[in-house]
């Protein structure tokens, strides 16, 4: 709710300011058509500038990459375009998250999926991802919007525990599969550390900064502070040899992540790593390759039985 309200206020404020400017300009003889054409351009300018900014930072703090994953210029342009598209889609998705991501109707189920979003987002960012899972016959698929946005990761983990309880009550399923994007993976791990892994069949993280991200230094908030490299909270979380507290885990990450820096921060040594190239941070949620990898992992979890 918090993120949707903030975004809606920003969009509404921008629309009022833009409309007022257009009204005054047209009143003084300016043509109307440039302002009409400028409506989508004004909106798209924001994700464009953010995409450029994140890519510059990602290059500056980049991890040393193997020579064989170098991207040619056309591939780099395509990657930039996909990330820009993902960011441009995110605001309307998050504003409309209650309509796009309602909980499934209560019904018996064997292995529900729970999606956990990253910092500053809400369940709306998963809308395309969930549609694909459901099209593959996977479900029921739930998503949690936790908040307030900049609270501690432990606070979010408590909300995950409540959500898992709600899912169990609605489906009768004793376990869920958790899929976490970005900070969502850390929220899942914090849940496992606080509440144990008895109710989680498998943990799938996507673009999660398991060892922190330099980008987190640019923003304020408790959850951001917990994602800064080498901070005490992360050191404690990573202090156990098993970072998922006995739950089978996989980290899906990209050498070209635009917000996890260095990109190798997503690498884990207590689970499986699925390493991709040519996909930036937000575009991971809309990428067919990532979808296929997650579907495969869910299938493996469904046939593996409950962990001991």
Task: Describe the residue ranges of each PLM region.
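Acidic beta-to-alpha connecting loop that harbors the catalytic carboxylate
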Residues: 255-256, 278-280
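Catalytic histidine-centered segment of alpha/beta-hydrolase-like enzymes
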Residues: 152-153, 279-288
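Generic C-terminal helix-cap and adjacent flexible tail
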Residues: 299-308
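Short, proline-enriched alpha-helix->beta-strand connector loops that line the catalytic pocket
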Residues: 109-111, 244-249, 268-272
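Serine-dependent carboxylesterase/thioesterase catalytic core
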Residues: 114-124, 128-245, 252, 259-260
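Conserved loop-alpha-helix segment in the C-terminal half of the alpha/beta-hydrolase fold
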Residues: 255-272
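Flexible, membrane-associating and regulatory peripheral segments of lipid-active enzymes
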Residues: 1-113
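Post-His helix in hydrolase/transferase enzymes
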Residues: 285-299
């Amino acid at each position: 709710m918090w993120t949707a309200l903030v975004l809606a206020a920003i969009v509404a404020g921008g629309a009022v300011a833009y409309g007022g400017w257009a009204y005054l300009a047209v009143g003084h003889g300016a043509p109307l058509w440039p302002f009409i054409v400028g409506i989508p351009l004004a909106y798209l300018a924001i994700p464009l500038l953010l995409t450029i900014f994140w890519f510059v930072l990602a290059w500056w703090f980049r991890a040393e990459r193997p020579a064989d994953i170098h991207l040619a210029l056309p591939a780099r342009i395509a990657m930039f375009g996909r990330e820009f598209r993902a960011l441009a889609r995110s605001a309307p998705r998050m504003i409309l998250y209650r309509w796009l991501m309602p909980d499934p109707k209560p019904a018996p189920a064997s292995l529900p999926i729970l999606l956990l979003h990253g910092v500053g987002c809400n369940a709306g960012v998963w809308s395309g991802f969930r549609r694909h899972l459901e099209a593959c016959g996977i479900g029921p698929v739930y998503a949690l919007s936790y908040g307030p946005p900049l609270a501690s990761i432990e606070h979010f983990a408590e909300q995950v525990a409540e959500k898992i309880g709600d899912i169990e009550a609605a489906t009768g399923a004793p376990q869920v599969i958790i899929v976490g994007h970005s900070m969502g993976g850390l929220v899942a791990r914090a849940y496992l550390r606080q509440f144990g892994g008895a109710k989680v069949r498998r943990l799938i993280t996507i673009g999660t900064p398991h060892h922190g991200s330099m980008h987190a230094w640019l923003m304020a908030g408790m959850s951001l502070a917990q994602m800064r490299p080498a901070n005490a909270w992360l050191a404690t979380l990573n202090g156990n040899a098993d970072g998922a507290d006995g739950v089978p885990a996989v980290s899906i990450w990209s050498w070209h992540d635009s917000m996890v820096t260095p990109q190798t921060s997503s690498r884990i040594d207590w689970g499986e790593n699925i390493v991709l190239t040519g996909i930036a941070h937000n575009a991971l949620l809309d990428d067919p390759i990532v979808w296929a990898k997650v579907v495969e992992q869910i299938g493996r979890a469904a046939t593996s039985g409950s962990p001991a």
